[in-house]
Amino acid sequence: IEQNGTELKVSTEGFWYRTILWEVPIMALICELFYQETNQTRQEDEMVIQTVEDKISKYRNLNIVFAEFGTRRRHSFNVHDLVVRTLKEKGGGSFIGARNVHSAMRYKTRPIGTHAHEWFMFHAAKYGYKMANSVGLEHWTDVYRGDLGIALTDTYTTEVFFEQFDKKFAKLFDGVRHDSGDPLEFGDKTIAHYQKLGIN
């Protein structure tokens, strides 16, 4: 761990399959310590609950189902726990699960996840950037045989991903994951891509 002014650098060494597991707990810890050390006032529980309920209502009105993926950049364990609890209590059919296995177990919801960015980064290092998405998707389906079928789109930009996410992959995978950028713009691009492939 190194700190230079406000810049923090954390490194792990070892085999990839061992070091990758440090990403989530390290990022969650850094976020929680940041908020503690900078004395930033967090929203009261009632405001957190209201924010979550408002989002649930918006998604429900649009017939959108969603999963919770907030562990890495959460304010704190307590706030994150409150969010997942509220989603479970109020989410109904719109809330389909949580990425955090502990939260999923605690609130008896489905543990759900997608590829990590590192999956495609590994394939880029081994096969080259131009092949990273297509080879990564191919290897994923070889291993999981139809399970864990939500594809991550933004490792090397969504545009590049969709160039390689052809009809075969669009039918093999259950869906795609929005991870960065404007969600409405992403939704429009995704719908347009599926329509271009002749998939309704």
Task: State each model region's role.
Residues I1-L197:
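Buried, small/hydrophobic-residue-enriched core segments of structured protein domains
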Residues N200:
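C-terminal active-site-proximal or functional interface alpha/beta core segments in diverse enzymes
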